[in-house]
Amino acid sequence: MNKNSFQITNIKNVLFFGTSKIFKKFIEINNKYNLNTEIFTSKDQSKNINKDIKHKIINKIDKNFENYISKNYQPENTLFFSLGSRWIFKKNFIKFCKGNLVNFHGARLPQDAGGGSFSWRIMKNDRINNLLIHSVTPKIDNGQIIYYKKKLFPK
């Protein structure tokens, strides 16, 4: 894993995958900067999204989904942001995103790669919390680290 610079020029859109309790705040920030926002989630994760927040339920990320994105957005001007997404992004979709697909990971990498990182930390009595954003590559949780911030959970 590398920690290098990450830059998208002329960003116009932010597309979220997954779920977050703070989607409303993300939308407010994006609106402030005149960025189009769209949220895609799975059926089960949609239950965690406030009903006032517009979102689309999708079953899978496939060619039809890519066609939808191409019709409505330009991938080179779009930030694709995964927040606890249920999907494992395949090589073709990662390439389609033009290097603009990132993932929020709430734990350290590479120590806590993959799913279940919160549970593993509890079982290991690990008090280190980490907010981390990394680029998405075909290998899970192995992309370039773009941002991270460590904190200790109180005892």
Question: What is each PLM-predicted segment?
Answer:
Residues 1-155:
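One-carbon transfer enzymes
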